[in-house]
A protein has these predicted regions:
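Short loop/helix-cap segments at secondary-structure boundaries that form the rim of catalytic
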Residues: 32-38, 51-55, 77
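Flexible, polar/low-complexity N-terminal or interdomain linker segments that lie immediately upstream
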Residues: 1-34
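Glycine-rich nucleotide phosphate-binding loop and flanking beta-alpha elements
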Residues: 30-32, 49, 70
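Short amphipathic alpha-helix with an adjacent loop that forms part of the alpha/beta core around
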Residues: 14-15, 48-57
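Short hydrophobic/aromatic-enriched beta-strand-loop microsegments
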Residues: 40-47, 81-86
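Short active-site oxyanion
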Residues: 17-23, 39, 58-60, 82
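Catalytic cysteine-centered active loop of the rhodanese-like fold, especially the PTP/DSP P-loop
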Residues: 53-86
Length: 86
């Protein structure tokens, strides 16, 4: 398995509008509602057990408030065959 590609918050802008990418905000709903990256969908880390519902044909770009949840989720998703960045 290769390493997880990490990106900065600044680099997140590069993925906005890319139809081959799904941006996922892993924070809880309250944090997402208060502020989130335009175009991101909210799937709290605790609810990410719906792996089957994620598109296998897109790169998943994950973010959270500190980076630790997104790295854990990225590792889990990579093991299931998804292309991910955190």
């Amino acid at each position: 398995m290769t390493g997880i590609e990490t990106i900065s918050a600044h680099d997140l802008d590069k993925y906005y509008g890319d139809r081959n990418v799904m941006i996922i905000d892993l924070r809880d709903k309250e944090e997402y509602d208060a502020s989130h990256f335009d175009g991101a969908v909210n799937i709290p880390y605790e609810e990410l057990d719906i792996f089957e519902a994620l598109p296998a044909n897109k790169t998943l770009v994950l973010y959270c408030d500190r980076g630790s949840a997104s790295l854990l989720a990225a590792r889990e998703l990579m093991q299931r065959g998804y292309r991910v960045k955190s």
